[in-house]
């Protein structure tokens, strides 16, 4: 998992990530007329988001550096199985909508971040 920092440099933070959820959605537009007995729909706009969780890492160019400043567009890349040829990869231009820290009684410091599609370009899977 890699994400641009606020300066636009892509940073591989996969070592800090413990959980990741990807949502690639398609809006459906209801066009059902009163004369129908079932729904009619058209394909609407695509959307995408990431929900990411991890272990806090304050080292240079790691997760805290990437998410501590939430402004600006971020290129986000998720390659299933790593950056090995033919592995699936999803890349989107996103905005960071949240960066939250949690400190538990056992001393663990963890974070969650939400990233939402920004560019108006439909998210599509390709290969590394």
What residue ranges belong to the model's regions?
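Protruding loop/beta-arch "assembly-hinge" segments enriched in small, turn-prone residues
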Residues: 109-128
């Amino acid at each position: 998992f890699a994400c641009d920092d606020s300066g636009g440099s892509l940073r591989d933070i996969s070592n800090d990530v413990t959980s990741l959820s990807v949502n690639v959605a398609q809006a459906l537009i209801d066009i059902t007329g009163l004369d129908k007995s079932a729904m009619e729909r058209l394909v609407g706009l695509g959307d995408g988001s990431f929900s990411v969780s991890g272990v806090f890492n304050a080292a240079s160019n790691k997760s805290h550096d990437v998410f501590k400043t939430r402004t600006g567009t971020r290129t986000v890349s998720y390659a299933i199985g790593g950056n090995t040829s033919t592995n699936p990869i999803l890349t989107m231009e996103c905005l960071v909508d949240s960066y939250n820290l949690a400190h538990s009684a056992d001393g663990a410091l963890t974070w969650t971040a939400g990233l939402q599609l920004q560019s108006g370009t439909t998210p599509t899977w390709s290969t590394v």
